[in-house]
Amino acid sequence: MLGLHVGTLISLSLCILLEPVEGSLMQPCQPINQTVSLEKEGCPTCLVIQTPICSGHCITKEPVFRSPFSTVYQHVCTYRDVRYEMIRLPDCPPWVDPHVTYPVALSCDCSLCNMDTSDCTIESLQPDFCITQRVLTDGDMW
């Protein structure tokens, strides 16, 4: 009985000691300001802006035993509440609609990745990647 009690105290103490370390290393799932690029086929430049996106750590569990009959679902930091804003890209030809809509994160949540609204890949391009010439929102070129 004493061994069980001592083992429990050691486990509890270890959890209490490790909790602040883990909390300080991983940011929670929340909106953060991020530089992103907006571009559209037919327009010669991409616009670089700052907007809130969802980013941070979500607790996930990896099963010890993997069954071929079950699926493992991992939670990711994704949009809970989102607003869409529209911006006009500069220098688009007259036959191309210069307006681009982009999401603005109002709140975030750890949930399954929705491929309709999020980039669910393991490795993707950075959010500020541009194929065309970059223009800052103040008009300067990169």
From Swiss-Prot:
Is this entry keyworded Disulfide bond?
A: yes
Q: Cystine bridges: which residues?
A: 29-77, 43-92, 46-130, 54-108, 58-110, 113-120
Where does it sit, as one GO cellular component term?
extracellular space
Under the heading InterPro entries, the entry gives: Cystine-knot_cytokine, Glyco_hormone_CN, Gonadotropin_bsu, Gonadotropin_bsu_CS
Which SMART domains does the record associate with it?
Answer: GHB
Q: Which GO terms describe its molecular function?
A: hormone activity
Cellular compartments annotated: Secreted
The answer to whether the entry has keyword rRNA-binding is no
For this UniProt record, give its keywords in alphabetical order, as a comma-separated list.
Disulfide bond, Glycoprotein, Hormone, Secreted, Signal
Domain of life of the native organism: Eukaryota
**Gene Ontology biological process:** G protein-coupled receptor signaling pathway
Question: Which parts form a coiled-coil structure per UniProt?
Answer: none
* Residues modified by glycosylation: 33
Q: What does this protein do?
A: Involved in gametogenesis and steroidogenesis.
- Please report which protein family the annotation says this sequence is part of: Belongs to the glycoprotein hormones subunit beta family.
Quaternary organization: Heterodimer of an alpha and a beta chain.
Q: What is this protein called?
A: Gonadotropin subunit beta-2
Native source organism of the sequence: Oncorhynchus masou
Tell me the gene name: cgbb
